[in-house]
Amino acid sequence: MTILVLGGRGKTASRLAALLDQAKTPFLVGSSSASPSDPYKSSQFNWLKRDTWERPFEQAGKHGLGTISSIYLVGPPVMDIAPPMIEFVDLARAKGVQRFVLLSASTVEKGGHSMGQVHAYLDSLAEVEYVALRPTWFMENLLEDPSREWIKNENQIITATGDGKIPFVSADDIASVAFHCLTEWGSHKTEYVILGPELLSYGQVAEILTTILGKKIIHRSLTETGLAELLVKKAGIPADFAAMLSAMEVDVKNGPQEVLNNSVVEVTGNPPRYFKDVAEHEKHVWA
């Protein structure tokens, strides 16, 4: 039985693939940029091109793998995310897939917008098992532009979160939870809100980076509109997506993210990583 990992080059999927490889668990990576030089067996898969959706099921046999029985679902980079994902879930079910692990978000309830619609659809299917992973904000987002560039070149983190606190979580821990959910059957229909071990404001994150990098890093908090405009102008993010991201950041000010739980250790047996440890390991990115 083979696991299909979608979003193959993403933060969680790439880490999940490494864990599956280490465990010698049969898997296939689905990616729009799949090539023969990939480190793992892979297949073309593009959410925006339906003619690629069946290729992983065809390629599994060509790669000498068994039938695909489980899928790690990472959605496409579009606003209306649910229709193509639900259509693909139906295709996969017709191919014999029995379990789905969905990457959603802590702020998206079952039945809510985007991934929440996919979550609700999976829950409505009597014959499949699923786990919805609902992680909070990724620590590793600071390793990518525009945040990386702001920290490296401007000595600042720019958000619209004010002094609101977030239980930042590492993509390593999300991947570890996904690994256990995909390889240890029996969870049936459930969800895990995946949180880090501590609550941090971006001001506190800046203080940690100041200590680790040996230079003063500040947190600059903008208005919702100000951040959206900056993301469009400096990062080239589409206006509608930038507006959504900015609204999510402003919501942090009201404290809905200020919670902790034990999901990571309960599922994996290991405690989640602290931001200071991730930052110390990755500090070369901001040097």
Swiss-Prot record:
Q: Which Gene3D superfamilies match?
A: NAD(P)-binding Rossmann-like Domain, UDP-galactose 4-epimerase, domain 1
What is the annotated role of this protein in its UniProt record? Festuclavine synthase; part of the gene cluster that mediates the biosynthesis of isofumigaclavines, fungal ergot alkaloids. The tryptophan dimethylallyltransferase ifgA catalyzes the first step of ergot alkaloid biosynthesis by condensing dimethylallyl diphosphate (DMAP) and tryptophan to form 4-dimethylallyl-L-tryptophan. The second step is catalyzed by the methyltransferase ifgB that methylates 4-dimethylallyl-L-tryptophan in the presence of S-adenosyl-L-methionine, resulting in the formation of N-methyl-dimethylallyl-L-tryptophan.
GO molecular function annotations of the record: oxidoreductase activity
Q: Which keywords does UniProt give here?
A: Alkaloid metabolism, NAD, Oxidoreductase
Q: In which pathway does it act?
A: Alkaloid biosynthesis; ergot alkaloid biosynthesis
Record field: catalytic activity: festuclavine + NAD(+) = 6,8-dimethyl-6,7-didehydroergoline + NADH + H(+)
The entry assigns this protein to a family as follows:
Belongs to the fgaFS/easG family.
Q: What class of enzyme is it?
A: oxidoreductase
Q: Which cysteines are joined by disulfide bonds?
A: none
> What superkingdom does the record give?
Eukaryota
> What is the organism field in this record?
Penicillium roqueforti (strain FM164)
Enzyme Commission number(s):
1.5.1.44
Mind listing the GO biological process terms from this record? indole alkaloid biosynthetic process
Query: Could you tell me what this protein is called?
Result: Festuclavine synthase II
Q: Which InterPro entries match?
A: Ergot_Alk_Oxidoreductase, Ergot_alkaloid_biosynthesis, NAD(P)-bd_dom_sf
Classification of source organism? Eukaryota, Fungi, Dikarya, Ascomycota, Pezizomycotina
- NCBIfam families, alphabetized: ergot_EASG (TIGR03649)
